[in-house]
Amino acid sequence: YAKPGGNPHSAEVLPDGNVVVASSTGNLLSVYVYNGADSYVSRPAFTMPVHSAHNVVWDRKRGCLWTATGAQLLKLAYNGKRTAPELTQVRSYDMAAGNTDAHDLAPVCGEDAMYVSTNQHVYKFDCAAEKFLDVEIFQQNTIKSISTGPEGYSTIVMRPTSGGSNWWSAEVCDMKGNRLFNRAGYQIYKARWYVENPFGYPEVHTL
């Protein structure tokens, strides 16, 4: 539908159907107007500079957008104007000193919280208390993605095991480091459960 460029890492669907994309080397968030009549949109309707943008998550309860960059979590307001979209920063939350290069940001299934990973640490951000909490995990550094599911689902983690490359792996593991999936030759950067996401979407939707 669009070619954002700048090494897109994540995308999120906004309540009006528009799509926001995080591009890391482009250092920006791009909002594309969704039009069911068009098969391709050449340009974003809005862009916002975000250093090394890797992630973006819609928070349905608060009606806001979240993105983690460097050692900060940013809370963004969306104006809700489908044909003239805009994002503005509302607040920033600082992580502990020494954190760099935020990677993943993902809702915790069944909780009012999100996992945040940086090059050095993994946190759970309590959205109601607005606090970063430490997480018990087999490895704190360079976690590329974390994904949770309903009861009975393991929390799945992707961390690089690729030697000379520092971003991919052929396997997915759980929070204790146990291997859950492995395929020789695969280069996995991000692993997600394909499940409903009540943090961002209503129970009945068409996405």
PLM region spans:
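Conserved beta-strand positions in repeat-built beta-propeller and related beta-rich domains
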Residues: V21-T25, L65-A71, M114-N119, V157-G163
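A short beta-strand motif characteristic of beta-propeller blades
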Residues: Y1-A2, S39-M48, T88-A96, K131-I137
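C-terminal closing repeat unit and adjoining cap/tail of repeat-based domains
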Residues: S30-A37, K131-L133, E151-L207
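Short N-terminal edge-element motif at the start of the domain
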Residues: P8-S10, D16-V57
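Short loop/turn segments immediately following beta-strands, especially the blade-tip
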Residues: V33-S39, L76-E86, D126-V135
